[in-house]
Design a protein with these regions (language model features):
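Short beta-strand/loop motif that positions the catalytic acidic residue
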Residues: 203, 209-211
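Catalytic histidine-centered segment of alpha/beta-hydrolase-like enzymes
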Residues: 241-254
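Active-site glycine-rich loops that stabilize anionic/oxyanionic intermediates
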Residues: 30-33, 91
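Flexible "cap/lid" loop of the alpha/beta hydrolase fold
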Residues: 102, 110-142
Length: 268
């Protein structure tokens, strides 16, 4: 069954690939951030790649609907994707990327999931997740003092980043200007409800998993779960990286990403 899945994906991508010549990469950011979070990564990527980094609904300059769920976020992104796109999803963006890869496979050539999860909230059948009371506490903190706790959240994500203070000074003003507590609350509720586990076996494209070994938000055990349940996945753990390895270890992550994409494109 696995071989048939690979064969089907391979032939479909080969036919579609004839329509394009340039590598197309879409970067999907995480909760409470925006597309500017990828600025430190961009200089390390090949200059001849076409790179698209949209703001998820309710983040950055993208307006927030009355309610958010992963399907809505994914449909919004998928509708703007060209076929044969390489998807890079970080944290919440990684969950959206999983949904797109499962439901819009003709749009996705490869998947790279960075510091993300199949399910964030713990449950009886998923003990590796984060307890609900911690999620609710996070939500209340943001409602209480949005600027203060957004800065603290960003500091946590950028642990072990040498230029952390400079990056926070660059990123935080845009995040405060464009984000709202209401939008973040809706997105956090979408994260709490998200469960991609039933979709993992449907994701046929090659997948690279990148996690930081010091990540407390999405610890490596969440990457190990994905590696065990995705049909064609490789797990890479970046040493001394926390929740944003594409910032703290941008050159190393870019190297892994480029190696992954080049290998996939050689197959098609």
């Amino acid at each position: 069954m696995q071989a048939a899945c690979v064969y089907s994906w391979h032939n479909k991508q080969r036919l579609d690939r004839r329509k394009i010549d340039m590598t197309s990469l879409c970067l999907l950011h995480g909760w409470a951030t925006n597309s500017q979070i990828f600025n430190p990564l961009r200089p390390h990527l090949p200059a001849d790649w076409t790179i698209h980094a949209p703001d998820l609904a309710g983040h950055g300059r993208s307006t927030a609907p009355l309610s958010l769920d992963i399907a809505t976020l994914a449909h919004d992104i998928a509708s703007s994707l060209q076929p044969n796109t390489h998807l890079f999803g970080w944290s919440l963006g990684g969950v959206v990327a999983q949904y797109i890869a499962a439901h819009y496979p003709h749009k996705v050539t490869s998947l790279t999931l960075c510091a993300t999860f199949a399910k964030f909230a713990a449950s009886e059948d998923y003990p590796i997740g984060i307890q609900h009371n911690l999620l609710h506490r996070m939500l209340h903190l943001f409602e209480d003092d949005y600027p203060k706790h957004l800065q603290q959240f960003l500091e946590l994500q950028l642990l072990h980043t040498p230029e952390r203070n400079e990056l926070i000074a660059e990123l935080l003003p845009d995040m405060l200007r464009d984000g709202t507590p209401q939008g973040m609350a809706s997105a956090l509720q979408a994260i709490e409800a998200a469960d991609m586990r039933p979709l993992l076996s449907q994701i046929a494209c090659p997948t690279l998993l990148i996690f930081g070994d010091k990540d407390a938000l999405t610890p490596p055990r969440m990457g190990e779960f994905l590696a065990q349940h995705l049909p064609h996945a490789q797990l890479v753990c970046i040493k001394q990286a926390a929740h944003a390895p594409f910032i703290s270890h941008a050159a190393e992550v870019a190297q892994w990403l480029q190696r992954h994409i080049v290998a996939v494109e050689r197959l098609i």
